[in-house]
Amino acid sequence: QIAVAESARNVVCSGAKPMAITNCLNYGNPYKPEVYWTFKESLAGMGDACRKLNTPVTGGNVSFYNENPECAIFPTPIIGMLGVIEDVEKHKMSPSFKNEDDIILYVGSPRIGLGGTEYLKVIHGLTTGDAPLLDLDVELKVQQVVLQAITSGLVTAAHDVSDGGLAVCIAEMGIFSLLGAQIDLSVLSGSVHEIWFSEAQSGIVLTCQPNQKEALIKHLVQGGVEVVQIGTVQGDALMFEGVGSVSLDHLHSIYENAIPKVMS
């Protein structure tokens, strides 16, 4: 479900309506009961999400026996999502911050938790905990309302919260644009690490021009989704209120050199 929902969220954040999917399903030896169970449950979850989001499966493939003598790979469903932008010139959207002083909003109802996150894996070397909870009804509502806001011209940037959580989402928006931000996450409940790195589903970060803030928030609230202001676009660094700051030049260097560093 999460793989399908995140793919659709990405398409919505580009200004497009999700239309259909293809898939590549990668697993270990299906004759092992635990592997076959994960495959069966993945198919069921994918079907539930596709029916809810009205995105039929146009095709795909399955790859089994991805393992070595010690263990199989993690269950890995890969989703390719097709979307349609009605008017590319008017409605196309990107995740990059656009303008100084733009308002930064978090859309969605965060369910705080660190289970299965990149934070646990990278920082603590742990692969544990429950996967993030996904409510498909909430997911559909968030996607529909955000897409309406984008096509209405109320949004200047949109990026879904996924791997790495909210902090990584905001960092990417700054890295892609080299525009900084003043961020105050105290409006969200939970510990600092949970707020920053929880991979709670159905979350999207939007920006808008200051004179559009009231109209955008009104649209989102009337659409039945939660929204809170978490900052403004400004400067050349990401400044987290009460925590510290990091320059975008530093983040950009890390981002651009990540693959060469791993491969060297």
How would you describe each model-predicted region?
Residues Q1-E6:
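Glycine-rich anion/phosphate-binding loops
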Residues G15:
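Active-site catalytic microenvironments in core metabolic enzymes, especially phosphate/sugar-handling
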Residues P18-G115, Q229-T232:
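Glycine-rich anion-binding loops of enzyme active sites
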Residues G28-W37, G125-D135:
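Glycine-rich tight-turn/loop motif centered on a GG-T
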Residues V35-K40, L120-H124, M173-I175:
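Short secondary-structure boundary/capping segments
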Residues S42, A49, L53-T58, V62-I78, ...:
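Glycine-/charge-enriched secondary-structure boundary and capping motifs
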Residues T76, G116-L133:
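Gly-rich Lys/Arg/Thr-decorated short loops/hinges at beta-loop-alpha junctions or inter-strand turns
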